[in-house]
Amino acid sequence: MSGSSVRMYRATPRTNSAPPKLVVVESECLSPDERTAFALLSSRVAAILVPCPAQGELAIQCQAHSGSLNQAAVIATSQRGLPLLLEAGIALALRGAGYENEAAADMVFKPRSSGGLAAAIEYVCRLVA
């Protein structure tokens, strides 16, 4: 057997089918299409952009918005989003955000360059509608 294997484990099991109360998008900036989708999402649920998430960032944001980790949805756009994905009740990632993110995600969307972030945000909009 060559090489090492890495296994990703989630902090919370995904058994909750309730809509999220908080959506965290790991991104520094948004394109016009992404901004439009994010504005719609923000009108329906607490939604924040987190460019460089720190350890425990999701727990801090959940506490600030009176929610739990199980009530949070995360969209990871790069490898920096992995800690958020592992704690979130709903974990979404974009293709190209890193193998670990794709493995930890409930759903993987197209790359950002192909409209994946806007599609992921629109997906969460449907969850909270």
Regions found by a protein language model. Name each.
Residues 56-129:
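Mg2+-dependent phosphoryl-transfer enzymes with acidic/Ser/Thr/Gly-rich catalytic loops
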